[in-house]
């Protein structure tokens, strides 16, 4: 060997802690929140994360001389304190782009959140954010359609889209399921939806559900003169079965299908997204299992990272929480990852949890989906928070109407249109919410009953995962 090789073990910071390094535009940047074991220096912990998520191993190996380790290694170039947390710190790591397969979110996550999360030197580790370089973004497929194409396909403009999940989500026969879909769509919704765990169970095989849903959609379209859709969940136990279900939805003339992207996996999701673009189908994405990964404030992967990865992997709509409903998520954090789904450029903004500038180039945007414990009284806040390029989904807030699902759908549609009209007239939706809704309720008995039914329903629990900002 032409170079001297010294066997043994050396500290990670001797190789992977490089505070003088200036990241390149082509580097993939990551921010980790690290909590090390007692007595381990911050620099050693951060360097260990950089090493174990890139080229490193626990000992010096002779085969390092066969490559250019200095070119390929991950580098921790900055450490920051976490406001209000004396145990943890932020480690900023730069990875050369050649460490990752082009267009493969699976490969990126395998490196960044792989074995390193079981490292003994760490008590906790959380991936807070990723800056994807433009060279990597251009190699990804992205959303199969995007916001503008979806609006054109559905012929719906100037307002958020309106939907609901069919309830009860499990136990209905295919025919009864289709009946509930019809009631919701004729009442005024744009979409109805399979819940994440409805696939092909003994009480309702997928072919049966697809056929009755297609019948309900076509009948509601004839009655209302509007384009309607239902998120047919094609998530299955094998990719082959998933594509069979997607093909059948296409044969039935359905505009949109659905995938559980975390339980289904990024590889399956990217493949399905490519299929959707080739076959002219919209793709709705459910985030089932996300809270297992993202809810702990010190360990796991923040949802903003999952949202970024989904935009790259492919999807036209993604659940994001509601801020005001029953699910976790504060306002500023939610706005931060909504920006990552929809905007072409998102600047660094710690007040929204964005640690890096993120340039998305010409990649299409993704509709943010608000779903979970919302009802008509939430409509003004939802329209304010989520804006027009969103889908507002009321499950219990539709089916729980005393007069049934059609009346619940009508109430939500009237409330939405009243809020959009008030906003366009320059009114402050959140400050004037009661006046706006009560006035609309005078002309809609369905809305009036809904307002009375849901007036005491609130979900006032504190957020577990809060932004790390200085008070």
Swiss-Prot record:
It comes from Synechococcus sp. (strain WH7803). Induction: Transcribed during light cycle, reaching a peak after 6 hours of illumination, mRNA becomes undetectable during the dark. Part of the csoS1-ccbL-ccbS operon. Binds 1 Mg(2+) ion per subunit. HAMAP family: RuBisCO_L_type1. This is Ribulose bisphosphate carboxylase large chain. It catalyses: 2 (2R)-3-phosphoglycerate + 2 H(+) = D-ribulose 1,5-bisphosphate + CO2 + H2O; D-ribulose 1,5-bisphosphate + O2 = 2-phosphoglycolate + (2R)-3-phosphoglycerate + 2 H(+). Its cofactor is Mg(2+). Transmembrane segments: none annotated. The basic functional RuBisCO is composed of a large chain homodimer in a 'head-to-tail' conformation. In form I RuBisCO this homodimer is arranged in a barrel-like tetramer with the small subunits forming a tetrameric 'cap' on each end of the 'barrel'. NCBIfam families: PRK04208.1 (NF003252). The record marks 326 as: Transition state stabilizer. GO terms for cellular component: carboxysome. InterPro entries: RuBisCO, RuBisCo_large_chain_AS, RuBisCO_lsu_C, RuBisCO_lsu_C_sf, RuBisCO_lsu_fd_N, RuBisCO_lsu_N_sf, RuBisCO_lsuI. RuBisCO catalyzes two reactions: the carboxylation of D-ribulose 1,5-bisphosphate, the primary event in carbon dioxide fixation, as well as the oxidative fragmentation of the pentose substrate in the photorespiration process. Both reactions occur simultaneously and in competition at the same active site. It is found in: Carboxysome. The keyword Transferase does not apply. GO terms for molecular function: magnesium ion binding; monooxygenase activity; ribulose-bisphosphate carboxylase activity. Heterohexadecamer of 8 large chains and 8 small chains. Keywords: Bacterial microcompartment, Calvin cycle, Carbon dioxide fixation, Carboxysome, Lyase, Magnesium, Metal-binding, Monooxygenase, Oxidoreductase, Photorespiration, Photosynthesis. One of its GO terms (biological process) is reductive pentose-phosphate cycle. Mg(2+) binds at residues 193, 195-196. Its EC number is 4.1.1.39. Pfam families: RuBisCO_large, RuBisCO_large_N.
């Amino acid at each position: 060997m032409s170079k001297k090789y010294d066997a043994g073990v050396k500290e990670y910071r001797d190789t992977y802690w490089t505070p003088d390094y200036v990241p390149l535009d082509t580097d993939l940047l990551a921010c980790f929140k690290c909590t090390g074991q007692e007595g381990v220096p911050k620099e050693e912990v951060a360097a260990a994360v950089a090493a174990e998520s890139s080229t490193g191993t626990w000992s010096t190996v002779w085969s390092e001389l066969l490559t250019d380790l200095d070119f390929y290694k991950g580098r921790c170039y900055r450490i920051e304190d976490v406001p209000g947390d004396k145990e943890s710190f932020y480690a900023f790591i730069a990875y050369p782009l050649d460490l990752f397969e082009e267009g493969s979110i699976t490969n990126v996550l395998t490196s960044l959140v792989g074995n390193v999360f079981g490292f003994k030197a760490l008590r906790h580790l959380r991936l807070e954010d990723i800056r994807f370089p433009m060279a990597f973004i251009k190699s990804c497929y992205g959303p199969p359609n995007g916001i503008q194409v979806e609006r054109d396909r559905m012929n719906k403009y100037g307002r958020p889209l309106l939907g609901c999940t069919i309830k009860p989500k499990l136990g209905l026969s295919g025919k009864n399921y289709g009946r509930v879909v019809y009631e919701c769509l004729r009442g005024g919704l744009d979409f109805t939806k399979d819940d994440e765990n409805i696939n092909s169970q003994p009480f309702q095989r997928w072919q049966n559900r697809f056929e009755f849903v297609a019948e309900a959609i076509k009948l509601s379209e004839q009655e209302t003169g509007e384009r309607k859709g239902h998120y047919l969940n094609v998530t299955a136990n094998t990719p082959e079965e998933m594509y069979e279900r997607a093909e059948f939805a296409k044969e039935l003339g359905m505009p949109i299908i659905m995938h559980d992207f975390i339980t289904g996996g990024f590889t399956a999701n990217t493949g399905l997204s490519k299929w959707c673009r080739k076959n002219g189908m919209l793709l709705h994405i459910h985030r089932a299992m996300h809270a297992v990964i993202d809810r702990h404030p010190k360990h796991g992967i923040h949802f903003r990272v999952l949202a970024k990865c989904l935009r790259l992997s492919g999807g036209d709509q993604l659940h994001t929480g509601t801020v005001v409903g029953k699910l976790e998520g504060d306002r500023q954090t939610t706005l931060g990852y909504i920006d990552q789904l929809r905007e072409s450029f998102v600047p660094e903004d710690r007040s929204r949890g964005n640690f890096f500038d993120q340039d998305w180039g010409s990649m299409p945007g993704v509709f943010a989906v608000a779903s979970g414990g919302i009802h008509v009284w939430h409509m003004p806040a939802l329209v304010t928070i989520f804006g027009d390029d969103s889908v507002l989904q009321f499950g219990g807030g539709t089916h729980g109407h005393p007069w049934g699902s059609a009346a619940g759908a009508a109430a939500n549609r009237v409330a939405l249109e009243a809020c959009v009209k008030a906003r366009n007239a320059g009114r402050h939706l959140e400050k004037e919410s009661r006046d706006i809704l009560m006035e609309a309720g005078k002309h809609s008995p369905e809305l009036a009953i809904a307002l009375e039914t849901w007036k005491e329903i609130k979900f006032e629990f504190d957020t577990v995962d809060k932004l790390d900002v200085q008070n």
